[in-house]
């Protein structure tokens, strides 16, 4: 059997699978989990694939991209996604994580897929809310948006960010869809003075790019090497990965230079 991943509207990848382990459907999402000899378990959430053996790559990158550029990380907001492993990484900073996800049926169906599902859900520093309005009013050190936000959402989330806070969002991969990345950078640039694209170096199974945005905190100039060295139990993230994530080939530098703010 095969499953197909849409990388772009014109590019697809196929993966051999052995069996379907789970099929759960809600009003807004479809989650299927498959067994694969090559990649362990593979989750297909709508059109996106998650590889259980490689979950740590994105969660480590996004958590520590924010955590290692901020002196203090006390309050974090995660929206528009299901990745509880991201919260697990953020707990290394003794931070409080607000996690907004309305689809509890799908979230709970990841119980055997996310290695730290129970540890995160039962952590005293974790708050799960169905809607953002259910949370206490506060300002955040870091906001992670796990889907590409439109300008309206960027504006709303920015209002909850501390003056030196960091906003990280998912975007299209700049090599695969540079026009989409241009537009995402342009939208973010209307609200922040630092706006820089990055990717996950050496991650071969992803079609995602990301954007790091802030009013004051720079992802390279404000990098705190001592915090990186102090991290324990990480398998992907280090200082070299952090810096390499922002490296762009010459042609992309030319294409995106009008929209990058560094």
From Swiss-Prot:
GO terms for cellular component: cytosol. Keywords: Cytoplasm, Polyamine biosynthesis, Spermidine biosynthesis, Transferase. Spermidine binds at residue 83. Residues 1-249 form the PABS domain. PROSITE patterns: PABS_2. One of its GO terms (biological process) is spermidine biosynthetic process. Belongs to the spermidine/spermine synthase family. This is Polyamine aminopropyltransferase.
